[in-house]
């Protein structure tokens, strides 16, 4: 008999709207014993069945919903169905945008909570972020073998969020060959090198694909400052948009070395590309004091906020760094600025930019809005899936 999670009275409303999470405060009791990650049935306070979910006793998210169908088994065939459904969207995107790399599974928005899978050519890079995902590891890998027999599988479940689920960090070859130190991929006509084994996340920020392409529209003849550049995707795009020059700034020399290789790989003029290892906050202040000016600044910082307690501090950080950027722009210059913090709402981010403009004694015109690329879909019942937001601002 399947273990049942009984909700507290009145706490079923979010599940009736198909939100896939059950928080600890919504749980009245667990009827039976379940191992971490094991599949359980979620019921309302009267015992009415609501969903099939994975049990996670160590997390504030006590259960993540696998299925809304009572008779659906969570097995290899289940994962095959989910993978095939997700692939339909990616096939269309790959054909439309001439892609060989994309996010194959975007967690909850593809009906597989706690699971991220990125495809880079014939390498599938796996991140299992929840107890349920880890519990189903063998079934998922078998399903991947069935759906993608020609692909190698590499595990990058080396992220700290696993600790909240009571899980150890894991990394390494799961199936097939190990990825090369740098794997070439294509994106909107660009060739880019990806470090699957030691790079950020799964190796590359696929979610910024559309924003990188948009850079070409703003780069023509401009002097560009590319902040938090990582491996230079925005720099390559700016050069392809015929910028005057681009300075890429990052704290990682290894990332900057790959950025230079990416410029060379695309046959672009390396003399127009400069790579600087530095702290962006300190460099912006130094540039301001030295009177440096730019025509386009790209601001793509790492996540500033991990939980609600950090939100106020993150607001100050975003305001400060964007104020400094605005002070460095020539009149009519463009600022492309982003936040990848899910807790930072789009309207709040826009207000922060408006406040930054006041402090910079400038005005901004919001020209264009950005979001994560379409291979990172957001399902209607899970608005938390919308985490990346950005604006193109004309600073006057």
Curated annotation (Swiss-Prot):
GO terms for cellular component: cytoplasm. Its main location: cytoplasm. Residues 2-81 form the PUA domain. PROSITE patterns: PUA. It is found in: Cytoplasm. Its EC number is 2.1.1.191. It comes from the Bacteria. Keywords: Cytoplasm, Methyltransferase, RNA-binding, rRNA processing, S-adenosyl-L-methionine, Transferase. GO terms for molecular function: RNA binding; rRNA (cytosine) methyltransferase activity. The keyword rRNA processing applies. It is an enzyme of class 2 (transferase). Disulfide bonds: none annotated. Pfam families: Methyltrans_SAM, PUA_3. It catalyses: cytidine(1962) in 23S rRNA + S-adenosyl-L-methionine = 5-methylcytidine(1962) in 23S rRNA + S-adenosyl-L-homocysteine + H(+). NCBIfam families: PRK15128.1. Specifically methylates the cytosine at position 1962 (m5C1962) of 23S rRNA. Belongs to the methyltransferase superfamily. RlmI family. This is Ribosomal RNA large subunit methyltransferase I. It comes from Erwinia tasmaniensis (strain DSM 17950 / CFBP 7177 / CIP 109463 / NCPPB 4357 / Et1/99). The gene is rlmI.
């Amino acid at each position: 008999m399947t273990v049942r999670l009984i909700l507290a009275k009145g706490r079923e409303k979010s599940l009736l709207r198909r939100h896939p999470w059950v928080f600890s405060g919504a749980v009245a009791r667990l009827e039976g014993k379940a191992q971490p990650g094991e599949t359980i049935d979620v019921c309302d306070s009267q015992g009415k069945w609501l969903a099939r979910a994975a049990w996670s006793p160590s997390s504030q998210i006590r259960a993540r919903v696998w299925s809304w169908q009572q008779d659906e088994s969570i097995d290899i065939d289940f994962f095959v169905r989910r993978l095939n459904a997700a692939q339909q969207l990616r096939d269309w995107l790959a054909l439309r945008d001439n892609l060989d790399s994309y996010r194959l599974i975007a967690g909850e928005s593809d009906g597989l909570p706690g699971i991220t899978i990125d495809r880079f050519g014939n390498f599938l890079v796996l991140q299992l972020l929840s107890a349920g995902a880890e519990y189903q590891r063998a079934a998922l890998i078998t399903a991947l073998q069935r759906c993608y027999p020609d692909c190698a599988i590499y595990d990058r479940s080396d992220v700290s969020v696993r600790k909240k689920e009571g899980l150890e960090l894991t990394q390494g070859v799961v199936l097939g060959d190990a990825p090369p130190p740098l794997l070439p991929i294509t994106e909107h006509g660009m060739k880019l090198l990806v470090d699957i084994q030691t790079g950020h996340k799964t190796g590359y920020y696929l979610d910024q694909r559309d924003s990188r392409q948009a850079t070409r529209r703003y780069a023509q003849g401009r002097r560009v400052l590319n902040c938090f550049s990582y491996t230079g995707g925005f720099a390559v795009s700016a050069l392809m948009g015929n910028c005057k020059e681009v300075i890429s700034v990052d704290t990682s020399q290894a990332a900057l070395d790959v950025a230079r290789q990416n410029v060379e790989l695309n046959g672009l003029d390396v003399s127009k590309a400069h790579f600087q290892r530095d702290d962006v906050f300190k460099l912006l202040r130094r540039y301001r004091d030295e009177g440096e000016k730019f025509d386009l600044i790209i601001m793509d910082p790492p996540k500033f906020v991990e939980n609600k307690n950090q939100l106020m501090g993150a607001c100050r950080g975003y305001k400060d760094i964007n104020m400094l950027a605005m002070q460095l722009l020539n009149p009519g210059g463009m600022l492309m600025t982003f936040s990848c913090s899910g807790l930072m709402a789009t309207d709040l981010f826009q207000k922060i930019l408006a406040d930054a403009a006041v402090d910079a004694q400038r005005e901004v015109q919001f020209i264009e809005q950005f979001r994560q690329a379409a291979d990172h879909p957001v399902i209607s019942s899970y608005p938390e899936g919308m985490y990346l937001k950005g604006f193109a601002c004309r600073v006057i």
